[in-house]
Amino acid sequence: MREAVIAEVSTQLSEVVGVIERHLEPTLLAVHLYGSAVDGGLKPHSDIDLLVTVTVRLDETTRRALINDLLETSASPGESEILRAVEVTIVVHDDIIPWRYPAKRELQFGEWQRNDILAGIFEPATIDIDLAILLTKAREHSVALVGPAAEELFDPVPEQDLFEALNETLTLWNSPPDWAGDERNVVLTLSRIWYSAVTGKIAPKDVAADWAMERLPAQYQPVILEARQAYLGQEEDRLASRADQLEEFVHYVKGEITKVVGK
């Protein structure tokens, strides 16, 4: 199954890795494919997720050239018949090994940055609490396209740090403007955070949605069901029309997560 999914995007993957190697050799230590491609299967709007590890920081010329070239290998979900959205996260080895929280991210590229990139705006290196979650994902499920396996290269992220990152993420969503236009992703991400808070593991979005469905009061189940079906391409996404129900869902699930990870 995993090999078939990777084969489905092999041409695009080769192009992306080629761009990374061209700009980052000889400082390149590893490239890991993680996310839906290797855990649960690519869905209609799934990204291709790559974690790249290098030995030194990027100079500004390299950063800009790499990002501009990555832009040519990626497309926003639904905009291309042959290209998927690509998300590339780059870390410097000594910033994350040995592990400490919060860790520093050297670079991140994704379709949400496209307009900024085209306008000449490039995100600098920054502290990123999400690296605790990302590295946990990579250690649990990934394929090394370059370099050693993730579980050999990276230290385990302590559960306390994972919980802290999950808890920090919850602060992003407090009122409807915080999820406007991104309703499906927020519903599914909250389900994954809830799953991770309870189990200490990370699951694909649809698996976490099924898990959450079994634990939700009946009045919130239509929200997660619609998000799941839209994610799988089985139903149109109409979550924006469920404004009151959606807000109640968000606050309920945040409350359940907080019971587990604390405040």
From Swiss-Prot:
Keywords tagged on the record: Antibiotic resistance, ATP-binding, Nucleotide-binding, Nucleotidyltransferase, Plasmid, Transferase, Transposable element
Protein origin, superkingdom: Bacteria
Catalysis performed (reactions): streptomycin + ATP = 3''-O-adenylylstreptomycin + diphosphate; spectinomycin + ATP = 9-O-adenylylspectinomycin + diphosphate
Keyword Nucleotidyltransferase set for record: yes
SUPFAM superfamilies, per the entry: Nucleotidyltransferase
Pfam families: AadA_C, NTP_transf_2
Name of the protein this chain belongs to: Aminoglycoside (3'') (9) adenylyltransferase
Organism, as annotated: Escherichia coli
Source lineage: Bacteria, Pseudomonadati, Pseudomonadota, Gammaproteobacteria, Enterobacterales
